[in-house]
From Swiss-Prot:
Family: Belongs to the type-II 3-dehydroquinase family.
InterPro entries the UniProt entry points to: DHquinase_II, DHquinase_II_CS, DHquinase_II_sf
EC number(s) reported in the record: 4.2.1.10
Catalytic reactions of this protein: 3-dehydroquinate = 3-dehydroshikimate + H2O
The name this protein goes by in its record: 3-dehydroquinate dehydratase
Originating species: Buchnera aphidicola subsp. Baizongia pistaciae (strain Bp)
Gene that this sequence comes from: aroQ
Site (Transition state stabilizer): 21
Residue positions of the active site: 26 (proton acceptor), 103 (proton donor)
HAMAP family according to UniProt: AroQ
Amino acid sequence: MKELFNILLINGPNLNLLGHREPKIYGNTTLSQLTHALTKEATTFNIHLHHIQSNSESTLINKIHNSKNNINYIIINAGAFSHTSIALRDALIGINIPFIEVHISNIYTRENFRSHSWLSDISSGVICGLGLDGYFWALRTAIKRIKKISTLQV
């Protein structure tokens, strides 16, 4: 029987508005459509994709804390919290689970305040500016890294 691995997908503030908010920047696909497609892709690799979206920093921090013993990898689009939340940074450092930071838009070509992320330097990697495709690249990379680690531990 193949081992089942778990990836946590975290979406921060305003990402619940995907498909409706600034479609020229974020596209027309809803968060529900995106997570459905990602879940389907993950399942083909025997990965269980867990998802949370919250506009509340404390909810995201609690979810991160509760992931310590059952999540193998995290994919996070912290939205605006990327630029403001040292608390999210500390939560991710505290659980020591590798993560990939994703941004739909290229944060380096937008307003100056968006060009700094408190998460980037502690992440395994950052994907930005690739639209929703960035989530799929992050998922594939996380799966590849999980599988590599699991074969090394056998």
